[in-house]
Curated annotation (Swiss-Prot):
Source organism of the structure: Aquifex aeolicus (strain VF5)
Any one of the GO CC terms: plasma membrane
Annotated TM spans: 2-24, 62-84, 97-116, 131-148
Chief location bin: membrane
Compartment(s) of residence: Cell membrane
Protein name: Uncharacterized protein aq_1188
Keyword annotations: Cell membrane, Membrane, Transmembrane, Transmembrane helix
UniProt superkingdom: Bacteria
Coiled-coil residues: none
SS bond list: none
Topology of the protein relative to the lipid bilayer: Multi-pass membrane protein
């Protein structure tokens, strides 16, 4: 099952890195579709999602040549999500999917943006950043519909 998720994450990573950089002008601020899939896969494959996050980030780092920073962020924020899900036991799974997960996504996206912006001055407007977050939210809703059974099974 982990290998299947790994292949799916790589396919989504390739698609997101081939579709969104021409639209937004760079490969650093793209929607976090593969990272969202890693977070949702944690409902099915549990702690193996950390390995999946690392490999996904490593692939992204190889494409944008950012020296392992994205893979480190993926692992840190996936671990933070897993810890928050285990510590904050919520009766309603929609709270963790629509409150904790977007918060983790926003923190990761802001961290990437701030670190990349110090290394390479990016010309990203608030509108582009908002569009990327909106795409993330739409994909979050779609993945919630797909993984609905596993989310409620955990609760």
């Amino acid at each position: 099952m982990t290998f299947l998720f790994l292949i799916l994450v790589f396919i989504i990573e390739i698609l997101q890195l081939s579709v969104f950089p021409p639209i937004f002008g760079n490969a650093y601020i793209v929607p976090s579709l593969a990272f969202l899939l890693v977070l949702f896969s944690s409902y099915k494959i549990k702690e193996k999602a950390l390995l999946l996050a690392f490999l996904s980030g490593l692939f992204y780092d190889a494409v944008v040549n950012f020296l392992g920073f994205i893979s480190l962020l993926n692992v840190v924020f996936t671990y933070l999500y897993l810890v928050l899900n285990n510590i904050l036991f919520v009766k309603n799974p929609k709270v963790e999917v629509f409150l904790i997960m977007p918060l983790i996504l926003l923190l990761r996206k802001l961290t990437i943006f701030l670190v990349v912006n110090t290394k390479f001055p990016l010309n990203i407007g608030l509108k582009d950043f908002g569009v990327v977050l909106l795409i993330d939210l739409i994909f979050l809703i779609l993945l919630y519909k797909v993984f609905n059974k596993y989310v409620y099974e955990k609760a």
